[in-house]
């Protein structure tokens, strides 16, 4: 895609469509905009089908690998030259937690025989296996629960996914996996959150523990 040079200005009245080749904004925006224009111009394309397909395309590579314990093996990481030196494996928890928090409400919908229903069912089944691997110390995809302060943030996204789809994503887990999650969430209290939005991450985890009937820290919720 075209990347706008620093200092270059947009042309007044410039219009973007699927055939645009003129300079417009930065490359990432141009590519995204053109893709969306193609979608808008496609005949008889439903919004829901389009967005569900995108959600599936984003989720499948993560969950299909993690369900087999192969996410960390197959997901290559690249870091900035200014990387702060923290353990790079935080990226795997970030990937899984934020993905699941995002698609959890979608996965709460009941199964059906539509194309969307089949996608949801497939992702949910892979997600349940991925959840188990995430807290199994013997799994290659055991996440970085015991190191780095960042795990409080991304652990909260995992907890949020359970809150958003409690019956579909938490209840089906086996008792060993549930016990492991409760232990991992509780040990995150070792991290003292700064007085920022990190307070919300702590409260999300404690709120989930309360819902699951486990011991929770009321102070961190209030």
Regions found by a protein language model. Name each.
Residues 1-43, 64-84:
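CBM-like carbohydrate-recognition segments
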Residues 5-8, 95, 147:
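Generic structural "secondary-structure junction" signal
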Residues 13-20, 83-93, 145-149, 193:
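Short, solvent-exposed segments of well-ordered alpha helices
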Residues 23-34, 97, 101, 156, ...:
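A structural signal for well-ordered alpha-helical segments within the folded catalytic domains
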Residues 38-41, 108, 211:
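Generic secondary-structure signature for well-ordered alpha-helical cores
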Residues 41, 63-74, 111, 139, ...:
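Residue-level signal for secondary-structure boundary elements
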Residues 43-129:
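Extreme N-terminal leader/anchor segments
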Residues 92, 103-106, 120-222:
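Aromatic-lined, polymer-binding surfaces characteristic
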